[in-house]
Structures are given as structure tokens and as C-alpha cells.
């Protein structure tokens, strides 16, 4: 799930119930088959919970709020529900959450101006290396800052119905614009920091949402972000989504991988 920050309406000084969650990749399209060979499905037992990104044969990168002790992954999938000949399944031998991630906010779905979801990043060490094939391929980490205004591609199996939270059958893609962090700072009451990216459409209609957490944000062909959190209903005007900014974490990622071969 993308970390959805539920909007709690204030009424007469009190807090009302949150509105229905509008949960899906909004304004997206079915990804071309095998066009995202680095995209990974992350599970808790047999329940799909998040996306992820294959960095090399042994390592998957995802969001820290996707953490469960029972995580496992599937690679080479297009259809979330069907067993495909291309699919590979791996257990997770160890999880490495970024030490700066505030786990006290883990799965806390309310809004507060002091909440800071920075460092929402986790590495998963696979119990057995993935077989690198035409449909299972790693993607490189960024070496340069992303450019504002870039066209970015996000992908995921996020929910396709607003109330039943039913995940998409086929991997979905959506094109988003990389926006100034100030836009997200104005849009959300939670803290938007320099280790985050802001992406969406000012007019709304395109967004990632519940079920897309941990998946890639690829800007001008380069992996730049990991889907982290955002507003619900998803795809609202002037409510772009927030992504973990990977260029800020390449040293931690590389060091963690090197020390845990």
C-alpha cells in the first residue's frame, strides 16, 4: 500500500471520521508486458502488500513502511493473480530498514503537522539470488539529481476500486510530472523534507495510491524515487504524491549491500 494519510476533517473543534479512501493508480494505463522487469511484488505470507525494485540479483529496495517479519517477493510478474512461467519467488532472509525512519509512525494513517515520514526506505536481502533474464532485470541507482519538470513513470498493482481495495490484476503505469517540493509542502500538513520528491499533476487526475508503495518512480529513464505517501482521495487537484528521493540514500544503500553479502 502507498502510505495514505487520511484527511480528518475538523468540525466544532473535534475530529470527524475520515472520508472514503479513493485507492488506485489514478489516470494510469496497463504497462506494456515485461516493460518494467525490475518491478517486484512484495508479500506478507501470501498477501500482496507493496511494490519493490530489484537492484541486483540479491537485493530488493522498497518502502520501510512495507516491513513485516514475514516478507517475501515475486519477480517477473505482469499479472498479480496468475502464476506466470516468467515468475520467480524468493523468501527474504533479512530486512534492513533505514535507521532514520521513524517506526513510531508505522502504519499511522492520520494527519499531523509534526509527522515526518522521511527515510521511508528498506532493503530486502533475498534468501536465494534471482535469475537475471529478459523479464527479470535490475535497475541502477541514480548518479545525478532529477530535474524539475521531468516526466516520471510510476508503476504498481495498487487498488483499482475506491471502497473494496481490490488490487489491479495487471501492472499499471502512470506518467507524473516532477514538481518542486514546495508544491507538496503547501499540499500536505505533514513535513516535506529534502529527502523526498514531489510528483503528480497540478490539476489532479494522475497519482499513485494504496497498493503502490515501494514501487519505482523513474524520471527520464532513471530510477529516482520510491513511492512513499500521499493524500486520500488520491489524484485530487493540488495534492501531488510524495516519494523517497534515492539520490540522498545511495551511500547507505551501497554500504548496506556491501556489508551484507
UniProtKB/Swiss-Prot annotation:
Disulfide cysteine pairs (residue numbers): 31-173, 50-66, 152-219, 184-198, 209-234
Pro-piece positions: 19-24
Active site: 65, 120, 213
GO MF annotation: an example: peptidase activity
UniProt record, GO biological process: zymogen activation
Recorded superkingdom: Eukaryota
Catalytic activity: Preferential cleavage of Arg-|-Xaa bonds in small molecule substrates. Highly selective action to release kallidin (lysyl-bradykinin) from kininogen involves hydrolysis of Met-|-Xaa or Leu-|-Xaa
Keywords for this protein: Disulfide bond, Glycoprotein, Hydrolase, Protease, Serine protease, Signal, Zymogen
Root EC class: hydrolase
Residues in Peptidase S1 domain copies: 25-258
Similarity field: Belongs to the peptidase S1 family. Kallikrein subfamily.
Free-text function comment from the UniProt entry: Glandular kallikreins cleave Met-Lys and Arg-Ser bonds in kininogen to release Lys-bradykinin.
Protein name, per record: Kallikrein 1-related peptidase b9
Amino acid at each position: 500500500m502507498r502510505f495514505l494519510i487520511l484527511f480528518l476533517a475538523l468540525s466544532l473543534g473535534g475530529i470527524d471520521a475520515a472520508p472514503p479512501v479513493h485507492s488506485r493508480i489514478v489516470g494510469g494505463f496497463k504497462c506494456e508486458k515485461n516493460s518494467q522487469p525490475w518491478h517486484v511484488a512484495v508479500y506478507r505470507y501470501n498477501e500482496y502488500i507493496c511494490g519493490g525494485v530489484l537492484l541486483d540479483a540479491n537485493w530488493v529496495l522498497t518502502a520501510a513502511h512495507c516491513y513485516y517479519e514475514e516478507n517475501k517477493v515475486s519477480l517477473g510478474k505482469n499479472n498479480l493473480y496468475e502464476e506466470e512461467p516468467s515468475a520467480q519467488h524468493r523468501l527474504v532472509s533479512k530486512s534492513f530498514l533505514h535507521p532514520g525512519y521513524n517506526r513510531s509512525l508505522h502504519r499511522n494513517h492520520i494527519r499531523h503537522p509534526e509527522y515526518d515520514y522521511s527515510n521511508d526506505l528498506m532493503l530486502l536481502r533475498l534468501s536465494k539470488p534471482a535469475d537475471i533474464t529478459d523479464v527479470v532485470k535490475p535497475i541502477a541507482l541514480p548518479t545525478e539529481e532529477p530535474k524539475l519538470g521531468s516526466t516520471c513513470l510510476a508503476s504498481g498493482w495498487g487498488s483499482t476500486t475506491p471502497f473494496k481495495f481490490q488490487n489491479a490484476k495487471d501492472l499499471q503505469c502512470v506518467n507524473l510530472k516532477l514538481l518542486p517540493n514546495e508544491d507538496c509542502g503547501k499540499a500536505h500538513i505533514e513535513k516535506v523534507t529534502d529527502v523526498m520528491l514531489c510528483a503528480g499533476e497540478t490539476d489532479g487526475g494522475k497519482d499513485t495510491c494504496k497498493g503502490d508503495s515501494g514501487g519505482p518512480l523513474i524520471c527520464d529513464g532513471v530510477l529516482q524515487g520510491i513511492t512513499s505517501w500521499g493524500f486520500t482521495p488520491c489524484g485530487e487537484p493540488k495534492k501531488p504524491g510524495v516519494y523517497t528521493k534515492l539520490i540522498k540514500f545511495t551511500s547507505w544503500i551501497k554500504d548496506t549491500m556491501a556489508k551484507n553479502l
